[in-house]
């Protein structure tokens, strides 16, 4: 089972709100997911990002692939850097 970390769209029309979820890559964008690890609100100024860092690092360590947008969110939060450092054993 290929697992991805991606955004699940919520909110009303023209006011998107996203949940950062871990899901099977074959399931639909807003369909079944394994675990919710955070939220992302692009409408707020500045954009609000809340991510459970421990859960994100756990899933990255287990081989989950983040989508491009989620990878950018993780990089801005410093999660990707921590993941790469832990991979190198530092």
Curated annotation (Swiss-Prot):
Gene3D superfamilies: 3.30.1320.10. Belongs to the bacterial ribosomal protein bS16 family. This is Small ribosomal subunit protein bS16. Keywords: Ribonucleoprotein, Ribosomal protein. The gene is rpsP. One of its GO terms (cellular component) is small ribosomal subunit. It holds the Pfam family Ribosomal_S16. The lineage of its organism: Bacteria, Bacillati, Bacillota, Bacilli, Bacillales. InterPro entries: Ribosomal_bS16, Ribosomal_bS16_CS, Ribosomal_bS16_dom_sf. It comes from Bacillus cereus (strain ATCC 14579 / DSM 31 / CCUG 7414 / JCM 2152 / NBRC 15305 / NCIMB 9373 / NCTC 2599 / NRRL B-3711). One of its GO terms (molecular function) is structural constituent of ribosome. HAMAP family: Ribosomal_bS16 (MF_00385). Signal peptide: none annotated. One of its GO terms (biological process) is translation.
């Amino acid at each position: 089972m290929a697992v991805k970390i991606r955004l699940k769209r919520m909110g009303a029309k023209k006011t998107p709100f996203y949940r950062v979820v871990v899901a099977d890559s074959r399931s639909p964008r807003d369909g079944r997911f394994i675990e919710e690890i955070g939220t992302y609100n692009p409408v707020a100024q500045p954009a609000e990002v809340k991510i459970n860092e421990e859960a994100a690092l756990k899933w990255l360590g287990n081989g989950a692939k983040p989508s491009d947008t989620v990878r950018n969110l993780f990089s801005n939060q410093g999660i990707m850097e921590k993941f790469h450092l832990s991979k190198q054993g530092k």
